[in-house]
A protein has these predicted regions:
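Conserved, mostly hydrophobic/aromatic
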Residues: 31, 45, 78, 115, ...
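C-terminal alpha-helical cap/extension of soluble enzyme domains
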Residues: 2-9, 18-25, 44-51, 222-223, ...
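A general structural signal for well-ordered alpha-helical segments in protein cores
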Residues: 38, 75, 108, 193, ...
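Active-site beta->alpha loop and helix N-cap motifs at the rims of alpha/beta catalytic domains
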Residues: 2-164, 302-305, 324
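Catalytic alpha/beta core domains of metabolic enzymes, predominantly
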Residues: 146-149, 161-269, 273-277
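Short secondary-structure transition/capping segments
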Residues: 66-67, 109, 135-138, 168-169, ...
Length: 326
């Protein structure tokens, strides 16, 4: 860590910015983590795409089907790659935020302490999956307060539909007062995240993984962080970086130019969206990666791989998307 616990909020306001992507995990034929393939993906994301940061070992990465040592290994390789790349010719080091979410609090703390020890920049933990509805707000607040007490590293909240509930902006704002809470990935509707931005946008980063709305959120809400999903490396190539481009233009106040670039990506978005089978985002993302020349591969159970028909539909959509490969 390059900051003290008391400095976490200030540090994140300056450094937890830009376009961040959530990794997919390549497995070999025996469904073990393919470390060579993953390192090559990391090099592409960090050096070719020059992403602001990477979100490691989350849902897209299939953390739920990994052992604790495997999750730690993903984190270690990611931190090593970011550190080895350095400041990338002056644009700054690629940040690393590790997803330490689990239903077991001891596992969450073990992964978060490991992240802190190996040099990750931040950790993110999704709100607990609750099986009973009584005193939900107090339960969630105490969960994050306990994590904040136990950790020095910057901590991001994460609330999504899989948790079974939506945290209210008021609850999120209360948690945002904790000393090392620095951000929230708020996978909810715009009314909620707009309200939360109005409440605490000067204290923590508020973000949402919908890439289509990212430009509007920069312009209208003053957002500085896309946190995050797979679009930064599925919608972009080494020679076609329109998401990065419209982000830079918008940050520079060139909103009309940014809008033109943003809108030009719609055929790619549509191809990616329309060819994605319901319930198979990881398998589809990996198939798209393979078409891009990245390392995708298979998914682990309980997830299902694409059928041959779904693969063919994905190939056709990819070929018609207009995404430039060279």
């Amino acid at each position: 860590m390059d900051y003290k616990k008391s400095e976490a909020k200030e540090y994140a306001r300056e450094h937890l910015v830009g376009v961040w992507a959530a990794n997919l995990t390549p497995f070999d034929d025996d469904l073990r983590i393919d470390e060579k393939a993953y390192r090559e993906n990391l090099d592409h994301w960090i050096k070719d795409l020059q992403l602001g940061g990477l979100f490691i070992a989350g849902k897209q990465a299939e953390f739920f089907s990994m052992s604790i040592p495997e999750r730690k290994r993903l984190m270690e390789m990611s931190v090593e790659a970011a550190q080895a790349a350095g400041d990338r010719g002056g644009i700054g080091r690629c940040g690393i935020i590790t997803s330490c979410s689990d239903t077991n609090l001891d596992v969450v703390l073990e992964l978060a302490q490991h992240s802190q020890n190996i040099g990750a920049d931040y950790v993110i933990v999704h709100s607990p999956v609750l099986h009973f509805g009584a005193d939900t707000d107090e339960t969630i607040y105490e969960y994050y307060r306990h994590l904040s007490d136990k950790l020095d590293i910057g901590l991001a909240m994460w609330n999504h539909p899989d948790c079974g509930y939506t945290m209210s902006p008021e609850l999120c704002a209360r948690i945002a007062e904790l000393p090392n809470v620095v951000a929230i990935k708020y996978s909810t509707d715009r009314a909620n995240y707009k309200r939360l931005t109005e409440m605490v946008g000067d204290k923590i980063h508020v973000s949402n993984p919908d890439e289509h709305d990212w430009l509007d959120n920069i312009i209208e809400l003053g957002w500085k962080l896309y946190l995050c999903s797979t679009p930064p490396f599925l919608l972009q190539t080494k020679v076609d970086q329109r998401m990065n481009e419209y982000t830079r233009l918008a940050f520079a106040g060139k909103h009309d130019e940014a809008r033109k670039v943003h809108d030009s990506l719609e055929p790619v978005r549509q191809a990616l969206r329309d060819s994605r089978p319901k319930g198979k985002p990881q398998a589809h993302g990996k198939a798209w990666q393979d078409l891009l020349g990245q390392h995708g591969g298979k998914v682990r159970r309980p997830l299902l791989n694409l059928t041959e028909a779904e693969l063919e539909a994905t190939r056709q959509a990819f070929n018609s998307s207009g995404l430039r490969l060279a």
